[in-house]
Amino acid sequence: LGLVGSEMCIRDRVMRHPNPGAGEFLAQHVDASIVNAGDGAHEHPTQALLDAFSIREALGTLKGTKVAIIGDIVHSRVALSNVLLLKKMGAEVMVCGPTTLVPKHMHTLGVRIEHNLQTAIEWCDVANMLRVQHERQDINHFPSIAEYRAQYGLTMDHLDALEKPIVIMHPGPINRGVEITSEVADSKHSVILDQVQNGVAIRMAVLYLLAEKRKLNNGK
């Protein structure tokens, strides 16, 4: 990838890789801009950008907004990128999931940690639901899908019991009927389709800014 890309004068590269830090490693060895499209269970920066944009679009601001990231935190590259960006933009962040799926180091990032779904959604303005990533698990982190659904699956009954409406997000793909029901995903509370649309614009903007920066640097 590095040598061939250099010979073809490719200046911008979008890279998804199963190993954490792969994009940073490549950036140190090629004369090109690397867009990290996800490196293992580490980070997914452009997803965080589109999520932050979608929240601001829905609520008007990020500062002071309470965002709960709920689900499989330990295997999610979306979670860490969201935490880092949202905190930087002034949002309050909570992570919620089974004790086996929430990394113990999360408290060092200045986020709240919760293990009860109802408590999390009563606290937040935005609930970002994450899927269970079976492909990254080498052991069972909970008894069964049915047990996970019962404890952490978001339903309309949960939302109807709230005193105030909240915004529902999901980075996709959705396991409908597991972490979120179809009724919730397709409800007026959901901005999931807006996230998809905003993702195109955000990633176009990233590539545009890289190209403009190169122009300012005399094409390098």
Regions found by a protein language model. Give the residues of each.
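Anion-binding alpha/beta catalytic cores of soluble intermediary-metabolism enzymes, centered on
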Residues: 11-85, 170
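Glycine-rich phosphate/diphosphate-binding loop of Rossmann-like nucleotide-binding domains
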Residues: 57-130
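Short, structured coil segments at secondary-structure junctions
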Residues: 29-31, 89, 107-109, 162-164, ...
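Single conserved hydrophobic/aromatic residue that forms the stacking wall/gate
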Residues: 1-5, 10
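Adenosine-phosphate binding glycine-rich loop
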Residues: 165-166, 171-220
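Rossmann-like adenosine-cofactor binding region
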Residues: 106-183
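Short hydrophobic/aromatic-enriched beta-strand-loop microsegments
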Residues: 33-38, 113, 191-194
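Short, acidic/turn-prone active-site loops that include or flank metal/cofactor-
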Residues: 38-43, 98-99, 195-199
